């Protein structure tokens, strides 16, 4: 009779008759009738019963001590009952959304939805005074944010202030406009939107984009377009002087192919012409060394900060005969120069080494002076120099020390 009643009840209510979910059956002497049993099963909700997992008991303790005989249902909570208790009792959807799910199930009452459109709070505790309900409710806290994100996409107050989202945080990041493309010199490069070159250690922004190395309007634009300008120093083509050319002619005489040069022989004893030729070469070597030591006086960057190494260059400047009289104070004579070349800070010429009496004539043909005063950048500051538009290294280092003193006084 008991098996028949249990079978009929199980067929009618499959979801409620999971082993371990209900209290143990009463003794056989006090078994209710079939109608009473059905009534009791239907009136008791599933979450009415206690969850033994939160009382500190081992859910698998009784499975070892007692065999399951159909009567000790509560004493042997199986793994199946453990899963169903979590599903139906602790993860009730009404705990997360309050009355929201009830309105969804009742057919979307529009008036009720308009009155409570904000749906504040994702957790509405049950009015349940049963023992263990608080402990069961605490299990759903880690699931709150994930459920809220799925159901209500307009509420994001639960997000962390330092979350990975960069929206509405006041921070924007844009890709840098200018980049160094490969196979281009680092002192001058262009991009799709702007072009930057460097003068005296600072950036010089040009107004017109151009692929040439010649700038648009500054003192160095009067040079040839093949010169490398807009750098910390000007690099130009160097013409060989007469000493070096004569040395090359004596060292490598141009003789017809297959013929022997005059004065030279293949004997072991040197001829008189060989001794004379070697004497001439020694004399030329001495002259060449003297010319190099006297003319090449490199400038050094001494006061420029963050300079890796010292940039050495030689800029030989010829006296500008057409310079105004007020610029005479800027001229200094290089006393160690063999030809008495005068340095004028307002003129930049091609780099010519001392090459005899024809120096001034050739230099004047390729030289042009300018009196335009343009601003340039020094140590990140926009400086306007009145004396010269393209200062020499010594002047640049002097202005560097002056700007540093001014900044220290302001501080």
From Swiss-Prot:
Region (Disordered): 1-52, 102-137, 156-191
Residue stretches of biased makeup (Polar residues): 33-43
Biological processes per GO annotation: meiotic cell cycle
Location relative to the cell: Cytoplasm; Nucleus
Function: Has a role in meiosis.
Superkingdom to which the source organism belongs: Eukaryota
Protein's gene: mug147
One GO cellular component term noted in the UniProt record for this chain: nucleus
Basic and acidic residues bias locations: 156-172
Keyword Nucleus annotated: yes
Keyword terms: Cytoplasm, Meiosis, Nucleus
Protein name as catalogued: Meiotically up-regulated gene 147 protein
């Amino acid at each position: 009779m008991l098996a028949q009643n249990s079978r009929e009840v199980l067929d009618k209510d499959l979801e409620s008759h999971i082993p371990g979910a209900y209290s143990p059956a009463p003794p056989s002497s006090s078994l209710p009738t079939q109608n009473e049993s059905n009534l009791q099963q239907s009136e008791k909700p599933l979450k009415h019963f206690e969850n033994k997992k939160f009382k500190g008991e081992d859910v698998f303790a009784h499975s070892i001590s007692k065999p399951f005989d159909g009567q000790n249902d509560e004493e042997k909570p199986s793994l199946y009952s453990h899963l169903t208790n979590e599903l139906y009792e602790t993860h009730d959807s009404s705990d997360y959304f309050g009355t929201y799910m009830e309105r969804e199930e009742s057919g979307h009452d529009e008036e009720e939805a308009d009155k409570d459109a904000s749906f504040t709070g994702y957790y509405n505790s049950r009015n349940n005074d049963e023992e263990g309900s608080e402990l069961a409710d605490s299990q759903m806290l880690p699931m709150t944010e994930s459920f809220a994100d799925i159901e209500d996409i307009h509420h994001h107050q639960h997000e962390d202030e330092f979350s990975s989202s960069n929206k509405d945080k006041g921070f924007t990041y844009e890709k840098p406009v200018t980049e160094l493309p490969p196979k281009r010199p680092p002192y001058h490069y262009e991009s799709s939107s702007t072009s930057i070159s460097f003068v005296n250690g600072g950036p010089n922004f040009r107004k017109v984009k151009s692929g040439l190395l010649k700038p648009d309007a500054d003192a160095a634009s009067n040079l040839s377009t093949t010169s490398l300008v807009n750098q910390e120093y000007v690099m130009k083509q160097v013409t060989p002087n007469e000493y070096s050319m004569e040395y090359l002619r004596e060292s490598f005489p141009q003789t017809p192919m297959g013929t022997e040069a005059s004065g030279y022989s293949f004997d072991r004893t040197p001829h008189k012409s060989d001794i004379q030729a070697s004497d001439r070469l020694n004399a030329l070597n001495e002259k060449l060394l003297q010319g190099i030591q006297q003319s090449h006086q490199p400038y050094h960057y001494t006061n420029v900060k963050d300079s890796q190494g010292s940039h050495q260059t030689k800029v030989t400047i010829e006296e500008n005969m057409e310079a105004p009289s007020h610029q005479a104070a800027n001229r200094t004579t290089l006393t160690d120069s063999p030809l008495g070349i005068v340095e004028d800070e307002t003129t930049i010429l091609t780099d010519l080494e001392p090459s005899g009496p024809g120096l001034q004539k050739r230099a004047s043909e390729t030289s042009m002076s300018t009196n335009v005063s343009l601003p340039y950048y020094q140590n990140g500051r926009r400086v306007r120099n009145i004396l010269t538009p393209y200062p020499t290294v010594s002047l640049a280092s002097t202005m560097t020390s002056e700007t540093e003193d001014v900044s220290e006084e302001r501080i």
